Amino acid sequence: MKERYPTKKIYVGDVAVGGDAPISVQSMTYSDTRDVAATVEQINRLHFAGADMVRVAVPEMEDALALKAIKEQISLPLIADIHFNYRLALEAAKWVDCIRFNPGNIGEKSRIKEIVKACQERNLPIRVGVNAGSLEKEFDQKYGATAEGMVASAEYNIKFLEDLGFTDIKVSLKASDVDRTVDAYRMLRPKNAYPFHLGVTEAGTIFHATVKSAIGLGALLLDGIGDTMRVSITGELEEEIKVGKAILKDSGRVQEGLNIISCPTCGRIEADLVSAVAEVEKRTAHIKTPMDVSVMGCVVNAIGEAKHADVAIAYGKGSGLVMVKGEVVAKLPEGELVERFVAEVEKFAGENG
């Protein structure tokens, strides 16, 4: 795994993005933003799920005017998502912690100047959010909806902001497929030091979005690219955070929580392994201490994996072993193994957290 690219550190509210800051995970509400109660409820759900910041759509002035009441009731940093109407950004900037605008549909550059001025006055960062499906006409005509087109748009708009004396910038380059998304980020990364917001847009249902995001975001993270990220899922908000954090952990960018090793099901399994692993996941989700644990369903690989795990279950016929650091600490009936295993995990976390 490569070292992370060194990037400029900016702040979205009190959350650092870039530099040596941890890679943050964010999501976006799907409520009508003007419905303050519904939007606050969704933001609080995301906060509870572990989101570091949240973005809301601002399609109309009524939504922009609701941001004050929303901001007063939440503690997560709030990002306003702006398309088409720059005046919405001017109102939103009074209340939020960051403005995202789409350069492909915001219109004349004089409008971007007004957005920059509003953000400068309030020390707000701006995300230049380039989408392959809505490039500016000149870049679309020259490059089409390609990675090259996204990079050209981003470079042009970054320079435009820099020429105005504005450098609290983060950048995103999103397409609905992995290939263009990854190519665009890889092309742009060596050309500037601004933090990158990673994401594959319009990724689909939880199954397809998880696969696309794991491949695309995982590849970029392994390359050392990325400072904040969103997994876009057509589904429940909490799933975006859950998948995003799992990608960060399994790419090695975050050392937190359990790495659960469990065998694929086969004819040798001598226990209800699927239920056991599901229960282990549920009952240990709160643990932040990094550790490797294994839950194995037969003797073929169980002992070998247990030797390398911090805590392990090795199932046999009707009973099994609980092991800590390769040493057997209990031989128990099958129905008692998970309970003892969880107790040993919590003990290990307490001693090593």
Swiss-Prot record:
Its cofactor is [4Fe-4S] cluster. [4Fe-4S] cluster binds at C263, C266, C298, E305. It is an enzyme of class 1 (oxidoreductase). GO terms for biological process: isopentenyl diphosphate biosynthetic process, methylerythritol 4-phosphate pathway; terpenoid biosynthetic process. It catalyses: (2E)-4-hydroxy-3-methylbut-2-enyl diphosphate + oxidized [flavodoxin] + H2O + 2 H(+) = 2-C-methyl-D-erythritol 2,4-cyclic diphosphate + reduced [flavodoxin]. It holds the Pfam family GcpE. Keywords: 4Fe-4S, Iron, Iron-sulfur, Isoprene biosynthesis, Metal-binding, Oxidoreductase. It comes from the Bacteria. Binds 1 [4Fe-4S] cluster. SUPFAM superfamilies: Dihydropteroate synthetase-like, Nitrite and sulphite reductase 4Fe-4S domain-like. Signal peptide: none annotated. Pathway: Isoprenoid biosynthesis; isopentenyl diphosphate biosynthesis via DXP pathway; isopentenyl diphosphate from 1-deoxy-D-xylulose 5-phosphate: step 5/6. GO terms for molecular function: 4 iron, 4 sulfur cluster binding; 4-hydroxy-3-methylbut-2-en-1-yl diphosphate synthase activity (ferredoxin); 4-hydroxy-3-methylbut-2-enyl-diphosphate synthase activity (flavodoxin); iron ion binding. Its EC number is 1.17.7.3. Converts 2C-methyl-D-erythritol 2,4-cyclodiphosphate (ME-2,4cPP) into 1-hydroxy-2-methyl-2-(E)-butenyl 4-diphosphate. Belongs to the IspG family. This is 4-hydroxy-3-methylbut-2-en-1-yl diphosphate synthase (flavodoxin). It comes from Sulfurovum sp. (strain NBC37-1).
